[in-house]
Amino acid sequence: MKILRKNHPLLKIVNHSFIDLPTPSNISSWWNFGSLLGMCLVIQILTGLFLAMHYTSDTTTAFSSVAHICRDVNYGWLIRYLHANGASMFFICLFIHVGRGIYYGSYVLSETWNIGIILLLTTMATAFVGYVLPWGQMSFWGATVITNLLSAIPYIGNTLVEWIWGGFSVDKATLTRFFAFHFILPFIIAAFALVHLLFLHETGSNNPSGLNSDSDKIPFHPYYTIKDLLGIFLLLLILMALALFFPDVLGDPDNFTPANPLNTPAHIKPEWYFLFAYAILRSIPNKLGGVLALILSILILAAFPLLNTSKQQGLIFRPVTQTIYWIFIANLLVLTWIGGQPVEYPFTMIGQIASVTYFTIITILIPISNTIENNIIKL
């Protein structure tokens, strides 16, 4: 078997990626989230496949088909709640994975980092179109509000919105194409994930110290396969606890009501994992400005490799930037909270302050702290 896995054309790829891969000996549990994201993607594709067997993408039957899955299909309720809460687990792992990349300076591996940003955007798009499929009140109005933002684009905006809708409002054509997008996008994510891994294995993994670890590498298997299995076990434990005991805790009560174009919900809001970006969107009074800020809130991650002037990789020995980093995380949590609040004082003002802080930290404060720390090293 040893010779086979090293010489067989297919097994050789697996061997170099997951078995004999030289890995830094000191990577911590924060490095587990890549494999957890892979596990989440597998869970989402499998549960989604079984849901697609019973779901109908028609405005008249979509809502009742979801109810049918929960009531009449064997373990349909479990598959549905694993899929819905699996999305939340996916985004928790995603945010931690990106946060770890920022903290330990993994963005210096720019190809891997940029593919990661594309993966994040694709996952967000997949989750958005998926949220529309149950055709509840929040599904319908969320789709209407978010797709309508494209009308802010000069000249082509209105045409673009009608083109995406497939008509003059969110209707049957919209639901059908959103189902098609939701089905195909996870496979595109899987393809991008392989490219992400390909670029990562070209350079090798980063490690908590930020130092070159070429002289201290160990094989991925069995050391990190066991470690990843523990992470996967804990992830499944949390996911099953969510799906079995608190299945609707992260959902919106409005989505238990079938979509009604004539009745607008009091507060239209997306799923919790989009709330930080939604808060940034709402904090700008101008429509086009809000849309640009929304897009920039994710694309600004691409600025990290460009704005990096530090002589050290990672924040482990940089207390000034560490402090700013944790303020940034706290600010993100504030934005998430504000995104779920009504548009009224004092929430609008807090949202505006938090939005300005979000961009200021990335573009101004972190580069300044890098320079300060570089000068301290010279002393």
Curated annotation (Swiss-Prot):
Which organism's genome codes for this protein? Akodon philipmyersi (Myers' grass mouse)
Where does this protein hold heme b b562? Answer: 83, 182
A GO CC term assigned to this protein in UniProt: mitochondrial inner membrane
Write down what this protein is called. Answer: Cytochrome b
Q: Fetch the PROSITE patterns from UniProt.
A: CYTB_CTER, CYTB_NTER
**Where mainly located?**
mitochondrion
Lineage runs: Eukaryota, Metazoa, Chordata, Craniata, Vertebrata
Tell me what topology the record assigns in the membrane.
Multi-pass membrane protein
Q: Which residues cross the membrane?
A: 33-53, 77-98, 113-133, 178-198, 226-246, 288-308, 320-340, 347-367
Which gene name does the record give? MT-CYB
Keyword terms of this UniProt record: Electron transport, Heme, Iron, Membrane, Metal-binding, Mitochondrion, Mitochondrion inner membrane, Respiratory chain, Transmembrane, Transmembrane helix, Transport, Ubiquinone
Cofactor(s) demanded: heme b
